[in-house]
Regions:
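A structural signal for multi-pass alpha-helical bundles of membrane permease subunits
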Residues: 2-287
Length: 287
């Protein structure tokens, strides 16, 4: 009897988690895949028609292109700036205060940040009173105001700047913790051997930070693929700024097309899988 009870004990502990996983993750995922093969009202089977829309429609091709733009500039920007601030702030006297200032945008909701930056980018025709901070500065120095959110491709980069402003502090905090974990003996030994700061950074700092960098990069990549809040609040995907997640939202709630929205969700999920696989593989190597 005791042996049987011992065999059931792991199931008792794991069972609720497995049931929760099946109900709230596996079932919705499978249902989404099923709905992606149905029409807008989930009444008739349409085969791969929704996936054809995802990969051939002009609006989705624009969304893929913009997500790729975010993938490159946002990821490189946040990780590079985060690493730079992590190293520089570690050397200043008021480290905690400096970190708090840089990290502060993360404390603001992404919707709130989008609203603030939308006002900063606000455009009025030349000759009108400018209420946007950036255009007011341009006018003061004798330049014409720019439609930061209206003109492509500058509007995509203007949106990416908002993402950098929000997420750089997050990257800095994670990389700063890893940077402080680098043994000082390694750095001192390298300096004794005649290594300059660039060589120390290349041969000691980067290799020691590689696990943290991998985690931060994969986190930023996932954030890029599902970027939504900033786009929705500031442009709603108009003027050539559409992205995958925002298009999925529109298809589902604005156009009531469940089939297309589900197909976009499935494609987005498949795009995230390789990133998560690389992250898990890195963790297993470290273990």
């Amino acid at each position: 009897m005791r042996r049987k009870t011992g065999g059931l004990t792991p199931l008792i502990y794991v069972g609720p988690a497995v049931i929760f996983l099946l109900i709230y993750q596996m079932y919705p995922a499978l249902q989404t895949i099923y709905l992606s093969f149905l029409d807008r009202r989930s009444e008739a089977f349409v085969g791969l028609e929704n996936y054809k829309y995802v990969f051939t429609s002009q609006v989705m091709l624009t969304a893929f292109k913009n997500n790729l733009l975010w993938l490159v500039f946002f990821t490189v920007g946040t990780v590079s700036l985060g690493l730079l601030f992590a190293i520089l702030v570690d050397k200043v006297k008021y480290e905690s205060f400096a970190k708090s200032i840089i990290f502060m945008p993360m404390a603001i909701s992404f919707v709130g940040a989008g609203v603030v930056w939308k006002f900063m980018y606000t455009y009025k025709p030349p000759g009108s009173g400018q209420i946007g901070l950036l255009n007011q500065i341009l006018v003061i120095f004798g330049f014409e105001p720019k439609g930061w959110l209206l003109e492509s491709p500058i509007n995509n980069f203007a949106l990416i700047v908002v993402g950098l402003w929000i997420w750089t502090g997050y990257c800095m905090v994670l990389l700063s913790a890893a940077y402080k974990g680098i043994p000082k003996e390694l750095v001192e030994a390298a300096e004794v051997d005649g290594a300059n700061q660039l060589q120390v950074f290349r041969h000691i700092t980067i290799p020691e930070l590689r696990p943290a960098l991998t985690m931060v990069v994969t986190t930023m990549l996932v954030n890029v693929l599902k970027i939504f809040d900033i786009i929705y609040v500031m442009t709603n995907g108009n003027f050539g700024t559409e992205v995958i997640a925002n298009r999925m939202f529109k298809e589902m709630f604005q156009f009531s097309n469940t089939g297309r929205a589900s197909a976009i969700a499935v494609v987005l999920f498949l795009m995230i899988i390789p990133i998560m696989y690389a992250n898990v593989r890195q963790k297993l190597r470290e273990g």
